[in-house]
């Protein structure tokens, strides 16, 4: 039996992603876990523009792809699987040919789950870290795809790329 250093404690888990895994880790150590996700990650309400972007990408629209989140890459594939499964293989083939630049460990892990790896990983998993990594690259004339997330664009990164 594992030690129970958290026995008698109630721990609120405000995580959304991997909540069950995190809760189970705490419960194995004796904690009573209250799941209270504060953030909901939702798919785009209209899959049409997402699918169009995926089709463009599969048609070799990018030389480089900057992946900011692993969740975003997995959700692109889930959208493809739900709405146009025939697009999955061409999308993955294009992803394999494209130089993949990751912001942190989560997009790198998502790539590994697909049998791929990042070509360039930011030294720091921040917007500034990715910009610093990009400064060392010659991007002029290259078609760069940027995975955005949320409702606000990443202005510093978008402005750097322009």
Regions picked out by a protein language model, each given a short descriptive name:
Residues 1-162:
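Signature of uroporphyrinogen-III synthase
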């Amino acid at each position: 039996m594992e030690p129970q250093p958290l026995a008698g404690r109630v721990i609120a888990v405000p995580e959304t992603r991997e909540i069950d895994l995190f809760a189970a880790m705490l419960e194995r150590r004796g904690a009573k876990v209250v799941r209270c996700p504060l953030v909901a990650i939702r798919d785009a309400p209209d899959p049409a523009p997402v699918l169009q972007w995926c089709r463009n990408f599969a048609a070799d629209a990018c030389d480089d792809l900057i992946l900011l989140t692993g969740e975003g890459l997995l959700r692109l594939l889930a959208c493809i699987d739900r709405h146009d499964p025939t697009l999955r293989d061409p999308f993955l083939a294009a992803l394999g040919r494209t130089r993949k630049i990751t912001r942190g460990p989560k997009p790198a892990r998502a790539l590994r789950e697909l049998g791929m790896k990042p070509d360039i990983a930011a030294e720091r998993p921040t917007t500034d870290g990715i910009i610093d990594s990009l400064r060392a690259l010659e991007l002029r004339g290259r078609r760069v795809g940027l995975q955005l997330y949320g409702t606000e664009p990443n202005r510093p990164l978008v402005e750097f790329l322009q």
